[in-house]
Amino acid sequence: MKVVEVKHPLVRHKIGLMREGDISTKRFRELAAEVGSLLTYEATADFETEAVTIEGWNGPVEVEQIKGKKVTVVPILRAGLGMMDGVLEHIPSARISVVGMYRDEETLEPVPYFEKLASDMPSRIALVVDPMLATGGSMISTIDLLKERGCTSIKALVLVAAPEGVAALEKAHPDIELYTASIDDCLNDQGYILPGLGDAGDKIFGTK
């Protein structure tokens, strides 16, 4: 599995701001979208382009446009919605496919409750967004679903990842790509990433 921990100074700075314990919902939400945008920039760096001729201001001009598979953004509800706008900033024409998944606080296992995917998944590149890759369960289950629907090009974008989650994801889906702003130290006994960001969903939405 290709794992990219984005080291750009802007990414490191913004993730640092998100770790503040008393950060406001507004600020956390803004930063989640901003870092999601920067991760999208990295994740799409290998997209192929083709030369096309358009009518410019002074006559025909040759430009480059992205070719190949179209994109679908797959936010994992609910926290993944906080990164979605950052992706759409760069790819506004992307289809939005939604997967509802929550983590059982006792077993730490993912529990699916909703899905609405693009009808042409086999012909699309899926950018799966979720702020936290902790145990990896929700991401693994979501990618399982995407593959069942025929999607073969999948990239996962997360703000913060635990080494345990990275290892679990690589074992389950070695053929995907993972982009993250930070690989943190470890998980605690409750399955939270340390130092982490806290509960990203609660902070993005302002509700528990």
Curated annotation (Swiss-Prot):
It catalyses: UMP + diphosphate = 5-phospho-alpha-D-ribose 1-diphosphate + uracil. Pathway: Pyrimidine metabolism; UMP biosynthesis via salvage pathway; UMP from uracil: step 1/1. It is an enzyme of class 2 (transferase). Allosterically activated by GTP. 5-phospho-alpha-D-ribose 1-diphosphate binds at residues 78, 103, 130-138, 199. Binds 1 Mg(2+) ion per subunit. The magnesium is bound as Mg-PRPP. One of its GO terms (molecular function) is GTP binding. SUPFAM superfamilies: PRTase-like (SSF53271). Gene3D superfamilies: 3.40.50.2020. HAMAP family: Upp_B. Catalyzes the conversion of uracil and 5-phospho-alpha-D-ribose 1-diphosphate (PRPP) to UMP and diphosphate. Belongs to the UPRTase family. This is Uracil phosphoribosyltransferase. It comes from Shewanella woodyi (strain ATCC 51908 / MS32).
